Amino acid sequence: TSVGEQDVRDVASHSAEGSAFDFADSVLSGDSVSALRLLTKISRQGLRAWGGKRVSIRDAFALLMSAVNSEVTKTAAIIEFMVHTPDLEQAIKASGSRPSKPVISKMQKRLAVCDASHINKINAAILQAEKNLKVEGWRDTTHILEMFVFRVLKRK
């Protein structure tokens, strides 16, 4: 049997990286309910790594922040590109991603609520979360991540 792209996506979506990028997408899409729901799930079950091992939320903090940072960088590049050329497909290519239908759909949803000021707000919240952990010595990474979500909450 052959393994198709969708099969790979299905497996990846249940991996640690998949959950981390789902969290990042929720943050960038302004969906704080989904972001908090994912944190609750991760806190309870951990992130499942490729080998089946579960990674605790404490150990997953860096992975979650890295995924958010990576998606913020891509989204900012797309926003910047679209200022000059309003072609989403070309903007996605310029950001280093492949413009498949799911990617385009996700980015359209994201861009409907995420502008340059929201990107700046997320970057400031990433910095604050890192400061909470590394400088201020907060021990509860679940609390740090919840505060991160509240800081980037998109008000209607």
What does each of the following model-derived ranges do?
Residues 1-22, 26-33, 44:
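Long, charge-dense, solvent-exposed interaction surfaces that engage phosphate-rich ligands
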Residues 28, 32-156:
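Helix-rich C-terminal "collar"/helical-bundle subdomain used as an assembly and partner-interaction module
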